[in-house]
C-alpha cells in the first residue's frame, strides 16, 4: 500500500472586525471652567467669579462656594486674587465705600 501525503495550507481569518475608528469617535462636551472675572474687575452679588473642579482657588471674604466648587460673589465690589500659604490662591470681593 502506497502512502499519500497531503500538504495542508491553513489560513485563519479575523473573527472580529478591526473597529478602531468607530470605537474612538467620542468626545465630551466642553465644561467652560476657569476664571469668569479677573483681578480688579467689578463683581455684582451672585455673579460667578471662578468655575472649577475641586479647590484650585479658595474662597475668601465676600465669596461663596457652590456644591460644584464654583466661586461666586456674596457682595458687590472689586475682585482680588491673593496668594496664601505659599502656593495657594484665594479670591475675595472687596466692597467699595459709597
UniProtKB/Swiss-Prot annotation:
List the Pfam families hit by this protein, alphabetically. Ribosomal_L27
Give the InterPro entries listed for this entry: Ribosomal_bL27 (IPR001684), Ribosomal_bL27_CS (IPR018261)
What top-level branch of life does the organism fall under?
Bacteria
A GO cellular component annotated for this chain's UniProt record is: cytosolic large ribosomal subunit
Q: Mind listing the GO biological process terms from this record?
A: translation
Posttranslational mods: The N-terminus is cleaved by ribosomal processing cysteine protease Prp.
Q: Which UniProt keywords apply?
A: Ribonucleoprotein, Ribosomal protein
| GO terms of molecular function | structural constituent of ribosome
**Proregion positions:** 1-13
Family to which this protein belongs: Belongs to the bacterial ribosomal protein bL27 family.
State what protein this is by name: Large ribosomal subunit protein bL27
Q: Give the organism the record lists.
A: Mycoplasmoides gallisepticum (strain R(low / passage 15 / clone 2)) (Mycoplasma gallisepticum)
Amino acid at each position: 500500500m502506497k502512502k499519500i501525503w497531503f500538504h495542508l495550507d491553513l489560513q485563519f481569518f479575523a473573527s472580529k472586525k478591526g473597529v478602531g475608528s468607530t470605537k474612538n469617535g467620542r468626545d465630551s462636551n466642553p465644561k467652560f471652567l476657569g476664571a469668569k472675572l479677573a483681578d480688579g474687575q467689578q463683581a455684582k452679588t451672585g455673579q460667578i467669579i471662578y468655575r472649577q473642579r475641586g479647590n484650585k482657588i479658595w474662597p475668601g471674604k465676600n465669596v461663596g462656594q457652590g456644591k460644584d466648587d464654583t466661586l461666586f460673589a456674596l457682595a458687590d465690589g472689586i475682585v482680588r486674587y491673593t496668594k496664601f500659604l505659599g502656593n495657594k490662591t484665594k479670591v475675595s470681593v472687596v466692597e467699595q465705600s459709597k
